[in-house]
Amino acid sequence: MPDSTSSASRGGVRIARGASPWLLPTVATAALSLARARKSGRWAAVAVPTTALAAGMLWFFRDPEREITDGRVISPADGVVQSIMPWKDGRTRVAIFMSPLNVHVNRAPLAGTVTSVEHIPGGFVPAFNKESENNERVVWHFDTELGDIEMVQIAGAVARRIVPYLPEGTKVEQGERIGLIRFGSRVDIYLPEGIDVAVEVGQATTAGVTRIDRD
């Protein structure tokens, strides 16, 4: 089993693009309540939960630097492998569940060109539920050395907004940041026929680090 942490994040940690609508109001409220808490007990009572919430938001939207692993296909998401399923067209789908505690920035599994980015409206049931197949999603297609690679970002019960970073036609490097799913959710990657899967159900993955395929 590959080690998903051997090339873990190095260097600084920044805030993910697309976090502002949630993060800025929360941090501003926490800062205001802390400033007024010195003069008012009522504001002191407000400062505790708002500061805790702001700290949680900063953690949720962290975007650490990564040393990208060498390999044909690397994980697009931090999380846990939820399922590995043979698909009707010969491909293999690897589904990675992202909890609210994981990094929510997704990365390109291979180098190539973005040939399609399609937003599909849908529901918001928990991403580990079978009904999540009908959730809101963004479907990516990449033209790579292995041919067409499909990756799907799926919104969950908490994560109700997917933020793609790149438009169609963009050339990407392996491990490059391509989008954000706010809070918890799921990412599926479809491996072409003939590509062996290196991960196992229940294995932790790190975006840009864990190798998905086997030589």
Swiss-Prot record:
Annotated keywords: Cell membrane, Decarboxylase, Lipid biosynthesis, Lipid metabolism, Lyase, Membrane, Phospholipid biosynthesis, Phospholipid metabolism, Pyruvate, Zymogen
Family: Belongs to the phosphatidylserine decarboxylase family. PSD-A subfamily.
Source organism of this protein record: Streptomyces griseus subsp. griseus (strain JCM 4626 / CBS 651.72 / NBRC 13350 / KCC S-0626 / ISP 5235)
Name assigned to this protein: Phosphatidylserine decarboxylase proenzyme
Cellular location(s): Cell membrane
Modification after translation (UniProt): Is synthesized initially as an inactive proenzyme. Formation of the active enzyme involves a self-maturation process in which the active site pyruvoyl group is generated from an internal serine residue via an autocatalytic post-translational modification. Two non-identical subunits are generated from the proenzyme in this reaction, and the pyruvate is formed at the N-terminus of the alpha chain, which is derived from the carboxyl end of the proenzyme.
Biological process annotations from GO: phosphatidylethanolamine biosynthetic process
Modified residues (Pyruvic acid (Ser)): S185
Active site positions: S185
Subunit comment: Heterodimer of a large membrane-associated beta subunit and a small pyruvoyl-containing alpha subunit.
InterPro entries documented for this protein: PS_Dcarbxylase, PSD-A
EC number of this enzyme: 4.1.1.65
Domain of life assignment: Bacteria
